[in-house]
Amino acid sequence: MIVGLIGVVEKISALETHIEVQGVVYGVQVSMRTAALLQAGQKARLKILQVIKEDAHLLYGFLEEGEKILFERLLKINGVGGRIALAILSSFSPNEFENIIATKEVKRLQQVPGIGKKLADKIMVDLIGFFIQDETKPMHNEVFLALESLGFKSAEINKVLKTLKPSLSIEAAIKEALQQLRS
């Protein structure tokens, strides 16, 4: 699995960026924001998400870990694929997007190409608990992702997250949340 690339940027286009790494040129899909920060002929270090489908092997590149985490979370939403997730990251920084979700600005989300009212509403509902605005944020995000990977719904997880003590370790919080969800 490819998780990162360090090489020289050969070509930057709206569809794909080419990076040469020790004689091999990789086609990497990046957001417009990332593309704007890259320069042809310059060395770049990208965090990579490799997506293997029936008909394609895709590489998505990110300069920041926060962008990659948000992209991965967006892909988990039914109806959001790589194209729409990149369009969101091209339109908003992760912090801007977090504020849009926190303030429930559906109209701003609908300005992204490919996102209509129905999908914007779905994204809002699915991500409302992903961004927690307090000191327990790192713990809540880890617990949220762990519970989601076990098949629990966002609404159920958000309800339980509100009851967890901030002093719990991530492991203890997951155990406590599982007990509450299974009761």
Swiss-Prot record:
UniProt protein name: Holliday junction branch migration complex subunit RuvA
Task performed by this protein: The RuvA-RuvB-RuvC complex processes Holliday junction (HJ) DNA during genetic recombination and DNA repair, while the RuvA-RuvB complex plays an important role in the rescue of blocked DNA replication forks via replication fork reversal (RFR). RuvA specifically binds to HJ cruciform DNA, conferring on it an open structure. The RuvB hexamer acts as an ATP-dependent pump, pulling dsDNA into and through the RuvAB complex. HJ branch migration allows RuvC to scan DNA until it finds its consensus sequence, where it cleaves and resolves the cruciform DNA.
Region (Domain II): 64-141
Domains as described in the record: Has three domains with a flexible linker between the domains II and III and assumes an 'L' shape. Domain III is highly mobile and contacts RuvB.
Gene Ontology terms describing biological process: DNA recombination; DNA repair
Record InterPro entries: DNA_helicase_Holl-junc_RuvA_I (IPR013849), Hlx-hairpin-Hlx_DNA-bd_motif (IPR003583), NA-bd_OB-fold (IPR012340), RuvA (IPR000085), RuvA_2-like (IPR010994), RuvA_C (IPR011114), RuvA_C_sf (IPR036267)
Family the UniProt entry places it in: Belongs to the RuvA family.
Matching NCBIfam families: ruvA
Keywords annotated in UniProt: Cytoplasm, DNA damage, DNA recombination, DNA repair, DNA-binding
Region (Domain I): 1-63
One term of GO molecular function: four-way junction DNA binding
Subunit structure: Homotetramer. Forms an RuvA(8)-RuvB(12)-Holliday junction (HJ) complex. HJ DNA is sandwiched between 2 RuvA tetramers; dsDNA enters through RuvA and exits via RuvB. An RuvB hexamer assembles on each DNA strand where it exits the tetramer. Each RuvB hexamer is contacted by two RuvA subunits (via domain III) on 2 adjacent RuvB subunits; this complex drives branch migration. In the full resolvosome a probable DNA-RuvA(4)-RuvB(12)-RuvC(2) complex forms which resolves the HJ.
Predominant cellular place of this UniProt entry's protein: cytoplasm
